[in-house]
UniProtKB/Swiss-Prot annotation:
Pathway: Cofactor biosynthesis; NAD(+) biosynthesis; deamido-NAD(+) from nicotinate D-ribonucleotide: step 1/1. GO terms for biological process: NAD biosynthetic process. SUPFAM superfamilies: Nucleotidylyl transferase. It comes from Pseudoalteromonas atlantica (strain T6c / ATCC BAA-1087). It catalyses: nicotinate beta-D-ribonucleotide + ATP + H(+) = deamido-NAD(+) + diphosphate. Its EC number is 2.7.7.18. GO terms for molecular function: ATP binding; nicotinate-nucleotide adenylyltransferase activity. Keywords: ATP-binding, NAD, Nucleotide-binding, Nucleotidyltransferase, Pyridine nucleotide biosynthesis, Transferase. InterPro entries: Cyt_trans-like, NadD/NMNAT, Rossmann-like_a/b/a_fold. CDD domains: NMNAT (cd02165). Catalyzes the reversible adenylation of nicotinate mononucleotide (NaMN) to nicotinic acid adenine dinucleotide (NaAD). This is Probable nicotinate-nucleotide adenylyltransferase. Belongs to the NadD family.
């Protein structure tokens, strides 16, 4: 029997806007990984995005509305209030100091797995966390040989390994096939197309009230 505390989940993103593809996928992935709570970690200055995100206070407000119905989810605001780019390695080092006995499970999409080798100090990430990968439609790109080797080395078939070690494993979760992206939502809003099946009603109303993602909006 190990002396580890319950595993903690972290799910980072710009959430511009947050949508069902975020919330539903991470809830299912957390259940499969055996993780009881997940911190939603909105970033202020994204490193891997090619557009400037909406104002942080809007993204944070929408995220708070979106997770009201999910008691498993809460918000960690450390990155969104930072004036420097959000590098995962820096956040994980801080979290490890705060939670030395808890396995840390960092949730990402399959698209992020494909780009993982370009992340800052990516090899060192495995010294701080496990990765739980949420499968996502439209990411059928073949894995590189380096990624294949990484999965051979670190992938685990069951979630037990995530709770018996502090870090170092990759768990592939079978998440719902929700073909939703924030960029598609922004495109639909700017073209006055419906987004009812993509966004929580309160988030949709917030966007309408504050006139976000209109033609004059920079994103």
């Amino acid at each position: 029997m190990n002396n580890l505390r319950p595993a903690l989940g972290i799910f980072g993103g710009t959430f511009d806007p947050v949508h069902y593809g975020h919330t539903e996928s991470v809830i299912v992935a957390a259940q499969q990984a055996g993780v009881q709570s997940v911190a939603m970690l909105p970033c202020h200055i994204p490193v891997h995005k090619n557009h400037a995100p909406s104002d942080s206070h809007h993204r944070l407000a929408m995220l708070k509305l979106a997770i009201e119905q999910y008691p498993q989810l809460y918000i960690d605001e450390r990155e969104i209030h930072s004036d420097t780019p959000s590098y995962t390695i820096h956040t994980l080092r801080a979290l490890r100091k705060e939670y030395p006995k808890h396995p840390l499970c960092f949730f990402i999409g399959m698209d992020s797995l494909h780009s993982l080798l370009s992340w800052n100090e990516w090899q060192a990430l495995f010294d701080y966390c496990h990765f739980v990968v949420c499968c996502r439609p439209g990411t059928k790109t073949p894995l590189s040989e380096e990624l294949k080797a990484l999965l051979v080395e670190r992938q685990v078939a069951t979630n037990n390994a995530l709770h018996n070690a502090l870090h170092g494993k990759i768990f592939l979760a079978d998440t719902p096939e929700l073909d939703i992206s924030s960029s598609e939502i922004r495109r639909r809003i700017i073209n006055n197309l419906p987004t009812d099946d993509m966004l929580a009603p309160k988030v949709r109303r917030y966007i309408q009230t504050h006139k976000l993602y209109q033609p004059s909006t920079t994103f």
